[in-house]
Amino acid sequence: MNEALGTLISQAGTIANDARQVFGGLSTQQLNWKPAPDRWSVGQCFDHLMTTNSGYLPVIDDVLQGRKKSSVWQKLPFMPRLWGKLLIKSLDPSQARKIKAPKAFEPAQSDISGSIINDFVAQQSQVMEKMKATENLDLERIVITSPAATPVTYSLMDAYRIIVVHERRHFQQAQRVIETSGFPAGN
């Protein structure tokens, strides 16, 4: 297996395990508690990740089944590499700048189900399986269109990097929520 892909799959597995350990025991009330009206709850962080990741699953399926069609945007030289690097850098948790989620990927505003962490872990297994299934492909040369914005393109490998860095960013955001003064005590 490609070493970089193996590392990303391992990191995705760690995120799933850590999510289960850190947030799996939270009550529905705790999952839905928001530090401020304009801030996300733990549940919303994971709802957002699931919504975002679900946009990638059919794209990866199309690649695996040979149904991927190249768009005009994907054929522009240098654009996929530029977009990939830009998104990976901007989504890195070390970047203090907040980024507004695209409308299609905003989390639910109502109560999030108490099963959100288990649902995320289950979806993460699907994501990891899809990643493994592409191990024999040239992931740097396969260009996909972002599920968030049609003109944005990047390699499938960069898509995997984006998924993992995005998950780390929102995992840390969820950690900050439970560390916030006023977070409800467990039962």
Label for each model-derived stretch:
Residues 29-34:
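AMP-dependent adenylate-forming
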Residues 1-5, 109, 149-156:
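A short, mixed-charge helix-start or loop-turn motif at secondary-structure junctions
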Residues 15, 19-22, 56, 120-123, ...:
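Amphipathic alpha-helices that form helix-helix packing interfaces
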Residues 5-6, 43, 113-114, 159-160:
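Active-site rim elements
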Residues 25-27, 134:
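Short secondary-structure junctions
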Residues 1-17:
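Extreme N-terminal tail/first-helix region
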Residues 82-139:
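Acidic/histidine-rich alpha-helical segments that form the ligand environment
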Residues 35-88, 125-133, 137-187:
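Short, contiguous alpha-helical
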